[in-house]
Amino acid sequence: MIQTQSTAIKRRNSVHKNLFDPSLYQIPEPPRGGFQHQKKEYSKETFSNQVFGYDITSLKKRFTQLFPSNIQGYLPEVDLRITIICSIWYVTSSISSNLSKAILRTFNHPIALTELQFLVSAVLCVGFASIVNLFRLPRLKHTKFSKALNSFPDGILPEYLDGNFRSSILHKFLVPSKLVLMTTFPMGIFQFIGHITSHKAVSMIPVSLVHSVKALSPIITVGYYKFFEHRYYNSMTYYTLLLLIFGVMTTCWSTHGSKRASDNKSGSSLIGLLFAFISMIIFVAQNIFAKNILTIRRKVGILPSSSTDDVTSKEGQPSLDKTRFSPLQVDKITILFYCSCIGFSLTLLPFLTGELMHGGSVINDLTLETVALVAIHGIAHFFQAMLAFQLIGLLSSINYSVANIMKRIVVISVALFWETKLNFFQVFGVILTIAGLYGYDKWGLSKKDGRQA
């Protein structure tokens, strides 16, 4: 009997099938398009743990040890990866914002500038994707430059780049799928309206005043999540955001006050403020809409799927009533390319029927110097958009709005030093803004529900 029982046990072990194993009932997923995304075979450095060859944890520890022990407890927690991305984002944004104002002084055609900006961005996307695809060839993929390209965070580059230009670029990257069009068409509309209104505002009022209006975006974002999504925020969130907004507006209005006598065009200023406000609303709407699309973490996706992830309950049994979502996300190069193409297409009709037909000076004003500035502006905008997409996926909507406020402070500070005009109220406004950012990071959104925004 003992031998028979052990034999039966061996037979059951040889079958080794659990009736509650969800893999028994898994239905093969249908193809998600004309091609199947495949996993990368390239060795890729973990960007979240390494920055320029240094370990993030050791760098943070060394930096903290520079301060006395009684001060270390008051230091805010710093994510070095996000700090580096934000720093580069601030530099490129400063270049882009100040160049747009410089271009519009001699080339006062906001719609034409928007059209050229979309065109340069689309060309850069195709060129960058082609270079990455080239260095996926077997003879080039082990070079240092190829390893640097492969160290980009997840979600930046397409997964299907394999070195074959015809299949990867011509047949996949340049041929949009239904998913890509569903994702990028609404964002292209946001880009179209946002860029035109922003350039219109910059052409009518100072850059500082445009950014002071856009500084209201965190308040609008918090209001949306509170009244429409029923999110909870503690009182410190509102206090720190108000301090933040007050600091930004103090800096901007103190800069604008010195120009009020020379630029006293009430009608033009009012229209410029209206364009800036519309641009701010578009920014908030795009931020909220793009959050679920640009987030790389495995959470709710944009398409339903029969993926086997998270399909079992705690007891190990298959869950039939649990909603499952697709982990499929569109990479940021593809999003930026098709957003630029859609924005270019939508801007083409207003450009042809407006500035080109009725303002015949567009071609005459497009000098060689203007073309060079537009090219530099387009390159800076390309990197700015890529970094913004990456930050939207890494940060919450409120944190991204605050990072965007800090970006505006850097832009305004660069403009102030560029114009060599600095007064007490501008410095006071910058200090208030930094204090608001510190307070928001230290005490704001302390509740778990608030962190999920």
From Swiss-Prot:
Pfam family, one: TPT
Membrane topology annotation: Multi-pass membrane protein
Residues in the Lumenal compartment per record: 132-172, 223-234, 291-332, 393-413
GO cellular component term of the entry, any: Golgi apparatus
InterPro entries for the chain: Sugar_P_trans_dom, Tpt_PEP_transl, TPT_transporter
Cytoplasmic domain ranges by topology: 1-110, 194-201, 256-269, 354-371, 435-453
Transmembrane intervals: 111-131, 173-193, 202-222, 235-255, 270-290, 333-353, 372-392, 414-434
Alphabetically ordered keywords of this record: Membrane, Transmembrane, Transmembrane helix, Transport
GO annotation terms (biological process): endoplasmic reticulum to Golgi vesicle-mediated transport; phosphoenolpyruvate transmembrane import into Golgi lumen
Cellular compartments annotated: Membrane
One GO molecular-function entry: antiporter activity
Source taxon at top rank: Eukaryota
Physiological role: Able to suppress the functional loss of YPT1. May form a channel. Protein SLY41 is not essential for cell viability. The SLY41 gene is a multicopy suppressor.
Stated family: Belongs to the TPT transporter family.
Note: Present with 784 molecules/cell in log phase SD medium.
Protein name: Uncharacterized transporter SLY41
Organism expressing this protein natively: Saccharomyces cerevisiae (strain ATCC 204508 / S288c)
Gene field: SLY41
